Amino acid sequence: MKKIYDEYVEFMNTAKSVYISTVNEFRGGVAPEISYSPCIVDENKNTYILVSTLSKRTSSLIAQRNTSLMFIESEEQCEQIYIRTRLILYCTTLQIAREKGPIYLPWDMLVTQFTAKFGDIINTLVSLDDFKMFRFRPIRGTFIKGFGKAYNIRGQEMDQIEHVSFNIGEKM
């Protein structure tokens, strides 16, 4: 399973963006919300995004609700549209404070990484007060490479991988 581990980590690390699924307050209840954002990924498989509070999803992120992320192969790169490689992660959410100090995550270091990946637009975005940064820490996930090639991922280091299988005729 080391090969699968290496593949899914590489798949995350090369992604420029991620789909984000949140749950938001809506008419006294909740409603699902899906969006995307450019992202960076660190060596611990945490995903970071920089988004405006003007976006609907941001209120759910500020509330630090659990979130689902999906990294997915582009339609142009896939051989078969029904078999796009994808990585789905279930994550905790944390807003990154702009303050500095030992108890804070390194805002400046993350901004430097965003700038290296996406260019000067990041300097403009972080200068705007409505832009917030969030970290998604994976709890568990599923890596899907094709038919019969799905793998559950779990563990503190997200390194425990098992092939998903079921018997023919078995209901999922």
Regions found by a protein language model. Give the residues of each.
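Domain-wide signal for the mature, well-folded portions of proteins, strongly enriched
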Residues: 1, 14, 53, 92-99, ...
